[in-house]
Amino acid sequence: MADGLTKSAARNIFYGGSLFFFLLFAALTAHSHWYMVNKSTDNEGLTESVVAGKHIWEKNMCINCHSIMGEGAYFAPELSNVWERYGGHQNPEAARAGLAAWIRAQPLGTQGRRQMPAYDFTDEEMSSLIDFLEWTDGIDDQDWPPHPAG
């Protein structure tokens, strides 16, 4: 009997271990995908307007300055809780009006403040973008961001 591993035993351990961990990786990937699609996505709230708002978010590259749930740039405020910060849970109409007014106003020359570009959104585009921001507020982000101001 050999004192150590033979080449064939080492090869079998390597291939067996590789196959085991590959299958484990594939199973965890499939489960993660299933969980995201069936459990963690608010499919009922995912309306055409929310999808259109996401397309506006992407088309105007908002993520180059803002972040949602920590993903994106940190040049401008976090927006995953902007609906809550504007009081959307208590007064949705006032929150919609406040967000639309803020996005449209963009005061120029404010000392010590970064400037957001002025976007010429139509009323429908603005409504869709706000619907998207409202939808992101409903994502279970496990209390991220920790600071209420984003």
Curated annotation (Swiss-Prot):
It holds the Pfam family Cytochrom_C. Keywords: Cell membrane, Electron transport, Heme, Iron, Membrane, Metal-binding, Respiratory chain, Signal-anchor, Transmembrane, Transmembrane helix, Transport. It is a single-pass membrane protein. It is found in: Cell membrane. GO terms for cellular component: plasma membrane. The keyword Cytoplasm does not apply. Its main location: membrane. GO terms for molecular function: electron transfer activity; heme binding; metal ion binding. The chain crosses the membrane at residues 13-29. Heme c binds at residues 62, 65-66. Component of the anaerobic respiratory chain that transforms nitrate to dinitrogen (denitrification). Heterodimer of cytochromes b (large subunit) and c (small subunit). This is Nitric oxide reductase subunit C.
